[in-house]
């Protein structure tokens, strides 16, 4: 199976969870699955910005990324966090290579059109599927930081959920899994929804039932499913050790999203 895993910045702050996640990635790869990891790192980025005397700025929940913030993101996400995560996967016996979107021409970004200009905030314009296939053929797990270069030569900060969705869509992954700090997608009563089809996803978005960070995540899920990804799962990061069992039985926690129910 082709599996794309996205681990959020909050989970990366927990060393025990990261260790658990890396062991799971190694186990999946050793079982013959092709695994690709995408990560963000917003918490570490904000912390480093403050240490450098740069106050993080947000507009409607989205990070304002001026040139200085973008450069620090390259250092923190594309450097420290990326290499630490790739090394941690390697430490449990699975070869992994740390990349950002510009490495191996993995993907090309473009400035994201938004009502308010947020600076160097981008979206994925194209993906080099052959580069991913080459790494998988050589038994390597790509670990991708959510940054990519545009045709204009500028680096752009990419929403990690959107990057994971774009990469999963490009390689037509069997499953895309988001490991988050929430138990799953909730309905209007606050109860976790176990399984959703595209029609229900669109209804939740249209009726304003989902908000905050879950909104772009569901939009990313929708695009992945529409592009042919087999299924998407939104799971609490604390359940990382149970990932292998998800391919053997129905999902027991979190939310599974499919094209049709």
Swiss-Prot record:
The keyword Kinase applies. It holds the Pfam family AA_kinase. Keywords: Amino-acid biosynthesis, Arginine biosynthesis, ATP-binding, Cytoplasm, Kinase, Nucleotide-binding, Transferase. GO terms for molecular function: acetylglutamate kinase activity; ATP binding. It catalyses: N-acetyl-L-glutamate + ATP = N-acetyl-L-glutamyl 5-phosphate + ADP. InterPro entries: AceGlu_kinase-like_sf (IPR036393), AcgluKinase_fam (IPR004662), ArgB (IPR037528), Asp/Glu/Uridylate_kinase (IPR001048), Glu/AcGlu_kinase (IPR001057). The keyword ATP-binding applies. GO terms for cellular component: cytoplasm. Substrate binds at residues 41-42, 63, 157. SUPFAM superfamilies: Carbamate kinase-like (SSF53633). It is found in: Cytoplasm. Its EC number is 2.7.2.8. GO terms for biological process: arginine biosynthetic process via ornithine; L-arginine biosynthetic process. Its main location: cytoplasm. It comes from the Bacteria. Disulfide bonds: none annotated. The record marks 6, 217 as: Transition state stabilizer. Catalyzes the ATP-dependent phosphorylation of N-acetyl-L-glutamate. Belongs to the acetylglutamate kinase family. ArgB subfamily. This is Acetylglutamate kinase. It comes from Koribacter versatilis (strain Ellin345). The gene is argB.
């Amino acid at each position: 199976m082709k599996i794309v895993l996205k681990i959020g910045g909050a989970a990366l702050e927990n060393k025990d969870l990261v260790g658990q996640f890396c062991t799971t990635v190694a186990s999946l790869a050793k079982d013959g699955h092709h695994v690709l990891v995408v990560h963000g790192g917003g918490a570490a980025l904000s912390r480093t910005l403050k240490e450098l005397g740069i106050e993080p700025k947000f507009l409607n929940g989205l990070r304002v990324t001026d040139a200085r913030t973008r450069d620090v993101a390259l250092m923190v996400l594309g450097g420290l966090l990326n290499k630490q995560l790739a090394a941690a996967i390697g430490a449990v016996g699975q070869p992994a290579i740390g990349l950002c979107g510009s490495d191996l021409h993995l993907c090309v970004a473009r400035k994201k059109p938004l009502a308010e200009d947020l600076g160097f905030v981008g979206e994925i314009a194209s993906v080099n599927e052959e580069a991913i296939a080459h790494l998988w053929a050589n038994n390597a797990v790509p670990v991708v930081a959510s940054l990519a270069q545009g045709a204009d030569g500028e680096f752009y900060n990419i929403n990690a959920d959107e990057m994971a969705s774009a990469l999963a869509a490009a390689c037509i992954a069997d499953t895309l899994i988001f490991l988050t700090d929430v138990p799953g997608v909730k309905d209007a009563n606050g109860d976790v929804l176990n399984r959703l089809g595209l029609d229900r996803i669109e209804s939740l978005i249209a009726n304003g039932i989902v908000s905050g960070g879950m909104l772009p995540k569901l939009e990313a899920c929708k695009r992945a499913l529409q592009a042919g990804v087999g299924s998407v799962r939104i799971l609490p990061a604390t359940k990382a050790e149970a990932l292998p069992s998800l391919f053997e039985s129905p999902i027991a926690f979190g939310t599974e999203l499919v094209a049709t129910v």
